[in-house]
């Protein structure tokens, strides 16, 4: 499966929160990541599975 073509079920986004800030997440289709604006982190999605580990998250540039 091409990671660039994966999608996130909107129902899943309603359930998931950032493990650090407990805030809502949004899906970044271009980078295939779940983004926490509050924590300024982007969590990768690999093989259709969100990796919700702070240690795996990418910091968003200011």
From Swiss-Prot:
Tell me where on the tree of life, at the top rank, the source sits. Bacteria
- Residues folding into a coiled coil are none
Q: Name one Pfam family in it.
A: Trm112p
What does UniProt give as GO cellular component?
A: cytosol
Please name the SUPFAM superfamilies in this protein's record: Trm112p-like (SSF158997)
Q: Which InterPro entries match?
A: Trm112-like
The UniProt family comment states:
Belongs to the UPF0434 family.
| Descriptive protein name | UPF0434 protein Rleg2_3773
Which species is listed as the source? Rhizobium leguminosarum bv. trifolii (strain WSM2304)
